[in-house]
Structures are given as C-alpha cells and as structure tokens.
Design a protein with these regions (language model features):
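N-terminal cap/lid subdomain of alpha/beta-hydrolase-fold enzymes
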Residues: 50-113
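Alpha/beta-hydrolase-fold enzymes
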Residues: 167-168, 173-256
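Catalytic-loop region of hydrolases
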Residues: 20-65, 73, 363-365
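Conserved alpha/beta-hydrolase "acid-adjacent" motif
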Residues: 308-314
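Short beta-strand/loop motif that positions the catalytic acidic residue
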Residues: 295, 301-303
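Catalytic active-site module of serine/aspartate enzymes centered on a nucleophile-bearing elbow/loop
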Residues: 324-365
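Conserved acidic catalytic loop of the alpha/beta-hydrolase fold
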Residues: 114, 125-145
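Conserved hydrolase catalytic core segment
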Residues: 142-183
C-alpha cells in the first residue's frame, strides 16, 4: 500500500534509486589477504564502487563519496549533476560501498569460514584502508579534492582526515560525528537485540530471514529516523499516497524497512557503526580531542538540527577540537535524513553550501 512512499524514503536516505545516465556503473575491487584491525585476514576482500565523470590528466579532480548504512554507490546522486555541488564535467567522483552492505564483502556473500555470523567485525578504519588501496591500485589516485560523507559516510570522512591527513584538500560531513557516543550505542544495541531475540535468527545461522526480528528492528529505527516535529507536523503527507494515515505510514516503514536486507549484514554494519571513534586511531591513545586536533584540512560540518542519531550538541562539542572547521547545522525537521537531502529545501541548502565550500580557496592550506 505504501510502496511508493517507501521507495521515496529509501531513495532519500540513499538505500536505492536510479543511476544517472551513462555514469555510476558499479565495479568490484578485490584485495587478496586483506588484514583487518582485529588481525583477521579476509582471503578476498571485495569493495564495490562506481565512478562519475572523467579523471583528468593531472589526476587532481577526484572527490570520494563513501557510502552510509546499507547504501550502495548511488546514495549521493542528490549531490551530483549539472547545477548541483558536484558536476561530473568538473569532478571525477568515486562512490564506494561499505563492507557489509550485501554487495561489498558481507556476511551474506562470503564463503566459509567467514560466512554468516562468522564474518568478522569490520571497523570504519578497515573500510578506509581498503578504499585507500582501491584509489591507488585501481585508479592511480594519490590525492583527493575532497571526501564528502553522510552518516556512516561522514564517519569515514572524519577517519580519512585523521588517518591520511595529507591525502585530501578538505572534508564535508553531514549528519554524522567523529565518534559514536554512548547514546548512539544504546540505539544500535537496541536494534541488534531486536533482531537477535527472534528465535528464527538462530544465532545467525537462519534458513530464512528472521521476519519478526527484522520488523522489530524496523520499528525501533523508524522512531529515530525522523524528528518528533516531522511526525507532529505530518510531513510524511508530502509524499504519501492519497488516503495514507499515520498508521499506514508507520506500518509501511517497519514491516519492510530495508527491502531485501540480510539480518547478518544489518548487524555487521551496526557493529561497525558502534565501534567508530577516531580517537582510537593508532597514535592517539584513545583521545578523541587529540585526534580531532590533528585534522589539518578545512572541515564543513553539517549536522541536522533535529538528528536523533547524531545530535547537534555532539557536533558542537567536537568542533571545539577541530582546528579549521565551519559548523553549519541544517535547519530542518527531517531528522537524520536531512543530511541526505530528503526534501527539496534541504537539498538546496546542502548543494548551495557544499558547492561554495568546494569552490573556496582562501581557507585551504
């Protein structure tokens, strides 16, 4: 009943949507014997990616767009195109996909001994290290114009700036923080528990997807995705079909929140999210203040004013320690999804300010 509305929501937060014409074809980069932070070695770590535009002769027009939760490489097309912040005629855009999204190496597509629940937890730093190799080995790229990321993509952008401080000219972060703070871990643990409590989950060795657990996961997620004001003002009516009610909207959200997603994949990426903390980067002694203070490129930090995943106060706290930061909250009732341009007003705000930041020269080192 709410299929059109659900598709809108999934596109808005980057879980799907059509590719731009003649661009965005996905490819695989495979790393043999890739060693994770945990010490586990993946025999063939696969990173899916797509590119838009043309790499220039100097190889200096590259912008990296790392994916967010369960997203594919098409999750940033609200930012790409003529008249938007990232014109493929000017930039060579590389969009990558996190481990665990079901296409890059994931519990659902990896053979024994790392199949299903035996797939090792991967960190944000593992993902960044793999993409660093992709850029150098597959594309011959040694420097980036920018790293731009929404949500878990923003987590990766922060990690890039700490791990590879001279590899890019600037970073843009929307609806994300440099660390998953305790309240965020509470949310993620609640969603993991919701899936694992379903007897059909069978400790991850299920024969069919644990439907009840996935619906419980979706119900919790729905309560955090948008702001209280979004529900109060019934902003869901903007794209809902005629006759939709609060109940049909909520039912449509939780009953099939991420169509086709695998439970172990969902959990793997939540574990990645939980462990995010740039302070635990080797050399910083688990001190996030030191890690943030090491960032030597300009940062455009755009939290959503109503994000329940990444509260704006957490962003304000982190900016105290970042040397060259512009904090620009997104004035929106669309909660977490504001950072992915989930409506025309937020899309214009993001494109205008990210586009201006990309063109700015005075504050660049």
């Amino acid at each position: 009943m709410l299929r059109c509305f659900l598709l809108f929501l999934l596109m808005a937060v980057g879980f799907g949507g059509p590719a731009l014409a003649a661009d965005g074809d996905r490819r695989a980069f495979v790393i043999k014997n890739f060693t994770l932070e945990s010490g586990t070695i993946l025999p063939a770590a696969k990173v899916m990616y797509a590119t838009y535009g043309t790499l220039n002769a100097a190889r200096d027009n590259v912008v990296l767009l790392p994916s967010h939760y369960m997203a594919d490489a098409h999750g940033y097309e609200w930012l790409i195109g003529p008249g938007k912040a990232l014109d493929p005629k000017k930039y060579f855009l590389v969009a990558t996909e996190l481990f665990g999204n079901g296409k890059s190496s994931s519990p659902s597509n990896t053979l024994a001994p790392f199949d299903g629940p035996r797939f090792p937890v991967t960190s944000i730093r593992d993902n960044v290290a793999a993409v660093h190799r992709l850029l150098g080995e597959a594309l011959g790229v040694q420097h980036l114009r920018a790293v731009i990321g929404f949500s878990m993509g923003g987590e990766q952008a922060f990690q890039w700036a700490v791990t590879y401080p001279d590899f890019m000219d600037r970073i843009v972060v929307t609806s994300a923080t440099a660390k998953t703070w305790p309240h965020g871990i509470v949310r993620l643990e609640s969603e993991i528990i919701a899936i694992e409590t379903d007897p059909a989950f069978a400790s991850g060795d299920y024969k069919e997807q644990p439907k009840k657990g996935l619906q419980a996961f979706g119900a919790i997620w729905a309560g955090w995705l948008f702001s209280q004001g979004w529900w109060r003002e019934e902003l869901w009516r903007i794209d809902a079909p005629p006759g939709a009610t609060f109940r049909t909207v909520f039912d449509g959200l939780y009953k099939d929140f991420i169509p086709g997603a695998d439970a172990n994949d969902l959990i793997l990426q939540m574990r990645t999210w939980e462990g995010h903390d740039v302070g635990t980067t080797p050399g910083f002694g688990a001190d996030i203040k030191r890690a943030l203070g090491s960032i030597n490129v300009p940062v455009l930090y755009m939290p959503s004013e109503t994000d329940l995943y990444f509260p704006v106060d957490d962003a304000r706290y982190e900016t105290r320690f970042i040397p060259h930061v512009t904090l620009l909250p997104i004035p929106s009732l669309w909660g977490h999804t504001a950072g992915a341009a989930s409506n025309p007003v937020d899309a214009k705000f993001l494109n205008d300010h990210i586009g201006a930041f990309m063109e700015a020269k005075g504050e660049l080192r």
